[in-house]
Every structure is written in C-alpha cells, then in structure tokens.
Amino acid sequence: PIIRPSHTITAPTIGLGDTRPRPQAANCKHRCIYKRSFSRFSISLIPDFHYLCVMQKTTRYIQKSLEGIYPPEEIRAMTRLIWEDACGFSPVDVILRKDTVLDESLRKKIEVIVEKLLQQEPIQYILGHAYFAGERFKVGPGVLIPRPETEELTLLIMRENKNRQLRKIADIGTGSGCIAITLSRHFHDCRIEGWDISPEALCIATENNQNLGASVSFLQRDILQYTPHAEELYTYDLIVSNPPYIVPSEMAGMEPHVLDYEPHTALFVPENDPLLFYRAIARVGKKLLCKGGKLYFEINPIFARDMSEMLFSEGYCDVRTDNDLFGRQRFASATR
C-alpha cells in the first residue's frame, strides 16, 4: 500500500547525532558536521532514484548517495533525520514497513534533500531546525547553527547557578535564541533578555520563543556601540555570550558547509583583535552586573590564556576556564 506520514514523531534530543571533532580544527564553530570536501562531485554518480519507491531501497539510495562524502555514522544520523524529521516516519516504521511503497511527493522530497546534502548544505538548514537541550529550534541561513559545546555552556550555567536567586540575565549575541530560551525555561522567575545586532536572527529567535512557550525579551543592540542606560546599571545577575571568535587565518582548516552557508558575522573576528567582542562585553558587564554577578563565555581555545588575562585586567575576580567534552578550553567565567 502507499502510505503517508500520519503521526507526530518524537524528535531526537540532540542535533545531528554528535558533531565530530576534526584534529586540525580547534573550534566547534569550524564544523557542524564532519565532511570531506568535494569541490566537483558528479551528480551522475548518484543512484537512479525513480525505481527506488520502496522504503528499504530508499534508505539504501540515501546512504549510497552520501557514501564517500560523509563518515558512516553521520550518514546513519542523516538517514534517520530524513525519515523522521522530513518524512514523519519513526525508526520503527522504517524497519517494520521496509517494503512499503512511498508516494511520489515523499520520493521527490528525499531526492531534493539528498541533492542539497551533496552540495554540502547543512542538514539543519535543509530541514529548517536544529536540536538544542532536547528542544527543536528553528534555524536558517543568517543564523548560526547551535553546537553541542554551546549546550554544554548552558548546562554549566544552570548547574552552577541552581541555588542563586537570579533576577535578570542577558544573552549577548543570541542568534537563534537557544541559550536564552533554554535558560528561561529553567529559571522561571528570572527576566531574560536576548541581544543581537541582526534583525533576521531576532526574528527567528522570537519565533522560537513563541513556539517553545518561553518568555525571553529580544532586543536589537550592537554591543560594540552600546552604552547602558541609567536604569540598567548593576541590575543583571548574569551575562552569557557566545560571540564570534574565529580569526581569518583559521579559515583554511574549516569545512565548506560552514564557510559557504553559515553567517560570517557570527563566526569571524579581526585577525589583529580576536578578543574584540569579549572585551566589549566585559566592559559593559562591569556596568550592568550587580556585585557578585557572573559572566560566562564560549571561547576559542587558542585564546584561553588571553581571555583570562583580559578578564583580570578588566577588574573581574574568580576568573577560570573550563574544558568541553573534547578536552579543549572552551568556556570562560568570571565574577564582578
């Protein structure tokens, strides 16, 4: 029989499986999904899809098409997401209904997704969403795809501040709003703001806020030009930021799916001033944070020592760095 998805699937709790680290890539923003780069990939190598109308054969088509471009574990994860998120079939459906005939609209949808993956477009942009802290966030070109390391930072904040009475938090450079919204759903009695310079990012963040039932206030602000208002002084308990931190000299080690699709304004800083955004946030933080207020950053590991020195020089105490799951100095924190 020909079937169509008729149920709401249960979404995976993380993004596209685990994003795989590359030994030559120092930063999580260098990658989203591990891929080998093929600047000229012949579409003629893709199996003919028109006769692959049975679910089991369609799975083979997806995996064979992506073979040699993605590692096997990523191909399996992508296949699962294509079936589950794009087509509405659970892993159990795919197994139990392996001989089921798909309708033409689903076959066409899968063909289009595979073609985009062969052009190295991130699957999160293709599907229109990514997973963060167990929730589904809308993403698209112009908004950085959330990384697992950023989720680590958010969990670190929740763990370290679970016994504090937080009244006000700012997420500077909020992007899709994933940090701010996740914190809002955890710290229920706290006013949380998400700042960004990009109207496009703020639009997506606002939509995520509504979809997830959060209560974040999103504000368009340029942290490099921002002067706190009198009523804001010393009223924030916590500031968090995952600002741009990659220098142009690192571009050679980055994957095309990041360089060609994700917003450079969310990735790169000047070669001669890699702490540009951190310094600006630290200085604004001295005016916004109350006494004992906390500052949290996701950082570039190669500038971890410079970050610590900068925070000390700006008058912060309890400065420290923490490693991510891959053992890199990925997070910095300090107390006003």
Predicted feature locations:
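Short, charge-rich patches within N-terminal targeting peptides
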Residues: 26-30
